[in-house]
């Protein structure tokens, strides 16, 4: 007789202290990059590091461009505005970025295509006047 075990994976959410520690390290990595890889003036940068978006939530005004920047050494990530019906970005390798300009007020969740289910790599952009 054999018994089969069922395993279900749920996203793992980092606690606030862990997220802060990860995001502090992400910021140090970002500052070490050549300036050509930084967000452009007027853009908001969201860093991708250790399966975390840093910061995980941002609030911007309509017309603001958010630029996601991979500051990992080896891992690729993507940005997927799935609930908005947008296609997933291509995989972003270290020092690569992708951007999106938000024009309408609202709350816009996004995720990393390869890492949202197992690693809980999700974030939210809130657009408010």
Regions found by a protein language model. Give the residues of each.
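Extracytoplasmic copper-binding redox domains, predominantly the cupredoxin/blue-copper superfamily
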Residues: 10-129
């Amino acid at each position: 007789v054999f018994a089969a075990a069922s395993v279900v994976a749920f996203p793992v959410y980092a606690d606030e202290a862990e997220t802060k520690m990860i995001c502090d390290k992400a910021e140090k990595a970002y500052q070490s990059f050549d300036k050509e890889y930084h967000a452009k003036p007027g853009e908001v940068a969201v860093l991708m590091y250790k399966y975390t978006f840093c910061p995980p939530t941002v609030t911007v005004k309509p017309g603001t461009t958010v630029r996601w920047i991979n500051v990992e050494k080896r891992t690729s990530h993507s940005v997927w505005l799935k609930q908005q019906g947008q296609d997933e970005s291509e995989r972003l390798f270290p020092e690569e970025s992708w951007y999106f300009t938000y024009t309408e007020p609202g709350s816009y969740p996004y995720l990393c295509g390869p890492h949202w289910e197992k690693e809980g790599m999700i974030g939210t952009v809130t657009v408010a006047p």
